[in-house]
UniProtKB/Swiss-Prot annotation:
Its EC number is 7.4.2.8. The keyword RNA-binding does not apply. Transmembrane segments: none annotated. Zn(2+) binds at residues 890, 892, 901-902. Belongs to the SecA family. Monomer and homodimer. Part of the essential Sec protein translocation apparatus which comprises SecA, SecYEG and auxiliary proteins SecDF-YajC and YidC. Its cofactor is Zn(2+). Residues 871-886 have a biased composition (Basic and acidic residues). This is Protein translocase subunit SecA.
């Protein structure tokens, strides 16, 4: 109560922020006459002037009012559009490492031009991040005339570009592209074999459109680049034939319960698990197919791979539905993004799940993949010096943006008041009754000429509703992952008089629905339109626009509540843009996924006891509140998944930073002979310690063993026993020095034979190739450790602490192995110039030609495992991505200085 009173007196934090920003808006508006008086050439010269002032010590904040006034004036001249005051406020929020919530139709694309221009003045590059290629290309082309007028270069980064094109794209002042492509380019750059193969510059400023979709919805799925592993497609096919023979076990208190089944399904956690009865039955089936030995168990250590195949097959059959989670296209399984409804060609599920789904659908099974590089969006975007984002729906996730990314959310007021009417939810007992009510609502809208947008949560539901409308002779268009190519055209005309559009998840569509249809799209279809034709089309559109306004504007129908309130708000937000009238209503049934999983059985029982007749619905604020509480539960659980994923990935991220930093230093250094010398002394010293322990008696020495080891590992044939026999005073330290001297002489002799330059190039090539091979193996080891670490919870140990400790041990072992392998190769090999060229060519071919897969890994199962093991609370993460100094503590957690720990390689 006291906090509410204080808010009324001094305003909310959001109000105070807006009040401060409005003062700067007044400054910008006061400059407008001054900039209007400038000629085009004088206005264009401002960019060079600002850059010069930056070099002389002024800051971007000091330049902001003038820079924004410059862009606003240029926009008036190039586009005939003037930035509203609320767009200036949004731009200032975006420039200050915050998230701007701007409602649909408020001009986010135009708003982004202001902070993009300001931050591009530094010459360090700006990345404008969108959720798909279509929007990246569209926004780049739409804003190119404005930026070109101001002397800025613009380019677009999309899949399918070669390295040269990508390098040009990143060299531009402002680069538009998708979150996936920026992330994968970062990983590819850290797999390059020469500096010329890298395409990205240091990461400066990222401006993320639909920021909630990128940083929250997709944060659960790490970006993974993988290469082919061994082929096991036959086993997937054999296991796939067995899964349909298993019987699902239902809850004992349900009508479907028929006794103990073979597996249980946990839809909430996306898990399918064999029961004890199921384990016995599966073992019998496997033995019958000669996949398991008679006396063997599925859970023995030798059958881990077989168990993995069974689990993948079970999940494929029970949790992943065709036309909901994926579609079959050209004999391939194509994943459907659950958040945007878009297909993701080229993306594959990990952990053998994709192969299991391929076996289930009878399409060609592609090889399993081994991880070569991976990163989460959370850790990728925290690499930028400045990060900001905009979306129509961020306020419900403001806590997460602050907790994970350290980004505050500011709600930007609309330019015109919002007049959309949001009606209460209608809840029916069955889906059939719900769809009947939806059809009647649509029929009423069509009769009065009101356009309707119907939102569904899956392709399957959109096609089901489309079939019902077709039977009822109601003309309509369908917008889902199957009809990608027609997407922009369908959205552009969804505001036509009486139009009916069915759409899977509207998040990220990025195209405004203009009431009366999009007259600009009609003009674009004409070849060289005359002024008269344009005027006629505009006049005809104005008539249609007024008719649609009179009919009530765009009506939104939700056929099901999504698991996130934010996605529901995105659907609603398609209506009521720029003060237009509109309305929205959600129709639900007790058979909907969200209601079935999270709404209690008591609600269904209560509805039946109330004597509800067929076709009747419940509409009450209590019901709507109960549904929102269910959504909050899901949102909280998904937040836990994302935070848990980040906590585990942060361990790998610390190691990734060390490896990638060392790798980049290797690429940029032509001479690593000093590093090789230090490593060689370390490796020889460690080997000598094994056979001649420090400060030990001579009787404890294993000299013959040391001789054999030096020869086998390093090609070093030294008569150690003869040396000791000839020299009584050859003590431990002297012997060490003599061995190292001999090793150094032999290496120097090798350098004389092949030449300094050839050996330097060979050292670098060997170091890179060995590091990449070991890093790949280390990632696989980390994956295996990650999958089983939750079991430590049963032993009353903290799985995260155990993971940190063991991953550090693995990382230390990897670096020791790297030093030993590099020294061994360089010592034993007989180098010739053509060997160096062959090795470099082999690396180049591997880099360019190796088939790679770009995937999103599933994360739900990880959280389910951790919940089962009873994990402890989470920690808060803040942005902290500074470059590691040589005297800083090593990020691996050892407590040593970086230069004395994992920095010693470089």
């Amino acid at each position: 109560m006291i906090s509410t009173l204080l808010t009324k007196i001094i305003g909310s934090r959001n109000d105070r922020t807006l009040k401060a920003l409005r003062k700067i808006v007044k400054q910008i508006n006061a400059m407008e006459p001054q900039f209007e008086a400038l000629s085009d050439s004088e206005l264009q010269a401002k960019t060079a002037e600002y850059r010069q002032r930056l070099e002389q010590g002024e800051t971007l904040d000091q330049l902001l009012p003038e820079a924004f006034a410059t862009v606003r004036e240029a926009s008036k001249r190039v586009f005939g559009m003037r930035h509203f005051d609320v767009q200036l406020i949004g731009s200032m929020v975006l420039d200050s490492n915050r998230i701007a919530e701007m409602k649909t139709g408020e001009g986010k694309t135009l708003t982004a031009t202001l902070p993009a221009y300001l931050n591009a003045l530094s010459g360090r590059g700006v990345h404008v991040v969108t959720v798909n290629d279509y929007l990246a290309k569209r926004d780049a082309e739409a804003n190119r005339p404005l930026f070109t007028f101001l002397g800025m270069t613009v380019d677009c980064n999309v899949p399918g570009m070669d390295a040269s094109q990508k390098r040009d794209a990143y060299a531009a002042d402002i680069t538009y592209g998708t979150n996936n492509e920026f992330g994968f380019d970062y990983l590819r750059d850290n797999m390059a074999f020469s500096p010329e193969q890298r395409v990205q510059r240091p990461l400066n400023y990222a401006l993320v459109d639909e920021v909630d979709s990128v940083l929250i919805d997709e944060a659960r799925t790490p970006l993974i680049i993988s290469g082919p592993a061994e082929d096991s497609s036959a086993l997937y096919i054999q296991v796939n034939k067995l899964i349909p023979q298993l019987i699902k076990q239902d809850k004992e208190d349900t009508e479907e319960y028929t006794g103990e089944g073979h597996y249980t399904v946990d839809e909430k956690n996306r898990q399918a698990l064999l029961t004890e009865n199921g384990q016995i039955f599966v073992e019998e089936l496997l033995k019958r197919e000669d996949l398991l030995a008679e006396e063997d168990s599925l859970f023995s250590a030798t059958n881990i791979s077989l168990l993995h195949h069974v689990n993948a097959g079970l999940r494929a059959h029970t949790l992943f539905e065709r036309n909901v989670d994926y579609i079959v296209q050209k004999d391939e399984i194509v994943i459907v993004d659950e958040h945007t409804g878009r297909t993701m060609p080229g993306r594959r599920w990990s952990d053998g799940l994709h192969q299991a789904v391929e076996a289930k659908e009878g399409v060609k099974i592609q090889n399993e993949n081994q991880t070569l590089a991976s990163i989460t969006f959370q850790n990728y975007f925290r690499l930028y010096d400045k990060l900001a984002g905009m979306t129509g729906t961020a306020d419900t996730e403001a806590f997460e943006f602050q907790q994970i990314y350290g980004l505050d959310t500011v709600v930007i007021p609309t330019n015109k008041p919002m007049v959309r009417k949001d009606m209460g939810d209608l809840v029916y007992l069955t889906a059939q009754e719900k769809y009947a009510a939806i059809v009647e609502d649509i029929r009423g809208c069509v009769s009065r000429g009101q356009p309707v947008l119907v939102g569904t949560v899956s392709i399957e539901n959109s096609e089901l509703l489309s079939g019902i409308l077709t039977k009822e002779n109601i003309p309509h268009k369908v917008l889902n992952a199957k009809f990608h190519a027609m997407e922009a055209e369908i959205v552009a005309q969804a505001g036509q008089l009486g139009a009916v559009t069915i759409a899977t998840n509207m998040a990220g569509r990025g195209t405004d629905i203009v009431l009366g249809g999009n007259w600009q799209a009609e003009i674009a279809q004409l070849d060289n339109p005359t002024d008269e034709q344009i005027a006629e089309l505009k006049a005809a559109w104005q008539v249609r626009h007024d008719e649609v306004l009179a009919a009530g504007g765009l009506h939104i129908i939700g056929t099901e509540r999504h698991e996130s309130r934010r996605i529901d708000n995105q659907l609603r937000g398609r209506s009521g843009r720029q003060g237009d009238p509109g309305s929205s209503r959600f129709y639900l049934s007790m058979e909907d996924t969200l209601m079935r999983i999270f709404a209690s059985d008591r609600v269904t029982g209560m509805m039946k006891k109330l004597g509800m007749e067929e076709g009747e619905a419940i509409e009450h604020p209590w019901v709507t509140k109960a549904i929102e509480n269910a959504q909050r539960k899901v949102e909280g659980r998904n937040f836990d998944i994302r935070k848990s994923l980040l906590e585990f990935d942060d361990v790998a991220n610390d190691q990734r930073k060390v490896v990638y930093e060392q790798r980049n230093e290797l690429l940029d250094t032509n001479d690593i002979s000093e590093t090789i010398h230090v490593i060689r002394d370390d490796v020889y010293g460690a080997v000598i310690d094994e056979y001649i322990p420090p400060q030990s008696l001579e009787e404890m020495w294993d000299v013959p063993g040391l001789e054999a080891r030096l020869k086998a590992d390093f090609g070093l044939d030294l008569p150690l026993q003869q040396w000791l026999a000839e020299d009584d005073k050859l003590y431990e330290e002297k012997l060490r020095e003599r061995i190292l001297d001999e090793a150094t002489k032999l290496y120097a002799h090798k350098q004389e034979l092949v030449g300094v330059e050839v050996l330097r190039n060979f050292e670098k090539a060997v170091m890179l190739q060995t590091l990449d091979g070991l890093w790949k193996e280390h990632l696989a080891a980390m994956d295996h450790l990650r999958q089983g670490i939750h079991l430590r919870g049963y032993a009353q140990k903290n799985p995260k602490q155990e993971y940190k400790r063991e991953s550090f041990d693995l990382f230390t072992q990897m670096l020791e192995t790297l030093k030993r392998d590099v020294v061994s190769i360089l010592s034993r090999v007989q180098v010739q110039e053509r060997d160096v060229e062959a090795l470099e060519e082999q690396q180049r071919q591997q880099s360019e030609a190796a088939p790679r897969t770009y995937t999103h890994a599933t994360a739900e199962s990880q959280l389910a495992d951790e919940e089962a093991a009873g994990e402890e609370g989470h920690t808060t993460f803040v942005r902290d991505e500074q470059k590691i100094g040589r005297n800083d503590p090593c990020p691996c957690g050892s407590g040593k200085k970086y230069k004395h720990c994992h920095g010693q390689l470089t």
